[in-house]
């Protein structure tokens, strides 16, 4: 009798995706982040569901309902902080996952990569709307500033912003619709993640060398299930260290002040994982230019497969490209730092230089480095 996991219509899908999946024998820990993102998503949906049971999306009660969750609901504080810091862990894993894709040339799987870019954008939208829900000062002003950017769109901009707001300012209608979208988007993300996986399993995984591994495959279970479990344990450990010891480390103290439309905080800034894009936005003095740069800073990822000029897929044997990659990482860290600083003398010029470097590395220096390496192969 054939094993039921190979014949049952539902178990067959699980089996082909997580048990008998032929996997390259040499994939490193950089390939752990896909499963970690899945765990983060499940964790966020579960904690979010329990938070939604006690949260009210009305401007008069939103802030106090979050306080109520932390003070009066059994283990409400841990659910709330796991959700808030879970978002940070989610983005750490996302950035690592994208970085892995860039370094090892995984972007040559076009469908998988493009769905990944859509997933990144959807996750960013979800996180932004979630940040508005506690209705603190930074929630309100963050929502005001970011939605206002759409007014830079010629002709329809102002109408578009007021349509999103549901009025002439960020108010009850805005908060209610943001809650609705914040609730539904994670399920859309789940569906997209399944499509992401579907396309990945059409081609099979890439590996650190970037060379076809069809001649050397091993079953996903038990080899990579046990490896993933180690990653999950480390992820949960890091998350719980954050939640139990420094739950507000990555948050903004301004968000403990209820939203007040009459009082603007001195420094409006988003959560840390958006700071790099925020720095690029601020580095351009023109509003429309800034918005375009902001959008392009993420959408540029969709161009990466077309900028690949190297004869080799992975950067494993390409030292010049490796240097470029790590300069790009340093540049993104610089942008993240600048995004959290006030708009004054040294920071403005550093932000502008870092923004130019970001686009220059991806659009010019990396393809040039690849071409140089191609020529060096002929020597």
Curated annotation (Swiss-Prot):
CDD domains: cytochrome_b_C, Cytochrome_b_N. GO terms for cellular component: mitochondrial inner membrane; respiratory chain complex III. Signal peptide: none annotated. Its main location: mitochondrion. Keywords: Electron transport, Heme, Iron, Membrane, Metal-binding, Mitochondrion, Mitochondrion inner membrane, Respiratory chain, Transmembrane, Transmembrane helix, Transport, Ubiquinone. The chain crosses the membrane at residues 33-53, 77-98, 113-133, 178-198, 226-246, 288-308, 320-340, 347-367. It comes from the Eukaryota. GO terms for biological process: mitochondrial electron transport, ubiquinol to cytochrome c. It is found in: Mitochondrion inner membrane. Binds 2 heme b groups non-covalently. Heme b b566 binds at residues 97, 196. Its cofactor is heme b. Heme b b562 binds at residues 83, 182. Heme 1 (or BL or b562) is low-potential and absorbs at about 562 nm, and heme 2 (or BH or b566) is high-potential and absorbs at about 566 nm. Component of the ubiquinol-cytochrome c reductase complex (complex III or cytochrome b-c1 complex) that is part of the mitochondrial respiratory chain. The b-c1 complex mediates electron transfer from ubiquinol to cytochrome c. Contributes to the generation of a proton gradient across the mitochondrial membrane that is then used for ATP synthesis. Belongs to the cytochrome b family. This is Cytochrome b. It comes from Capricornis crispus. The gene is MT-CYB.
